[in-house]
Amino acid sequence: MEYHIRQYDLHQGALEIEYIEEYFGEFPRKKTADEVIRRLTDRDHQIVMAEAPLTDDPGTVVPVAYKVSHELRQNETDLKLADLVERLTGTVEFFGRKVLYSWIGGTRRDWRGQGFFRALTEEQEAWALDNGFDEILTKTKNRLYSMRGTLDHLEFNVIKLEPNEQDNRESKVYLSKKLGLEVLDRHRSKRSVIHSN
């Protein structure tokens, strides 16, 4: 199967993210286009979506999965990102390296288990290597078992667990993947990428 991926510029991509997140009931708070723009402005970033035809109407193509990632710097001024860097200090080396943070993403329920998230992640890795990144970081919740399993299959390593004392399922799990050309050799998805402006 060939996966069709669309890579967006900042403003159009932010609108697309606001739209697709409406399909994710498991996200308690959806990202707005303004929030995405504020987070990504003035930093290297990537917004990608996988598209597929509807099974009952193959002429209609819809977004089924997405990923948004951005550069994470040692000296962040954004309070949330500065807090993230602080939490990872001693675990991740930021000095003299480019680190990509896989911020948000997901696959619509009816499309899960079909390789869309793998294809987006592999495209993210190829883009990251092309743009000089050394490592990809991501964060998930302990209760998101299928996401943790997918990240394991994609060879992300757990680098930190931040326990939640009230409910272990809400504990934060930080994962990392160091990048090198050998990462591309392990890619399995066939992808075509369209750049939208």
Annotate the PLM regions:
Residues 107, 113-126:
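Conserved acetyl-CoA-binding loop-helix of GNAT-fold acetyltransferases
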Residues 105-107, 140:
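Hydrophobic adenine-recognition pocket in adenosine-nucleotide-binding enzymes
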Residues 118, 130, 142-161, 168:
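Conserved active-site alpha-helix within GNAT-family acetyltransferase domains
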Residues 57-104, 165-166:
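Conserved acyl-donor/pantetheine-binding loop and adjacent beta-alpha core of acyl/acetyltransferases
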Residues 99, 128-141:
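Conserved GNAT acetyl-CoA-binding A-motif
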Residues 163-197:
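C-terminal "cap" of GNAT-fold acetyltransferases
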Residues 1-64:
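Short amphipathic alpha-helix that is part of the acyltransferase structural core
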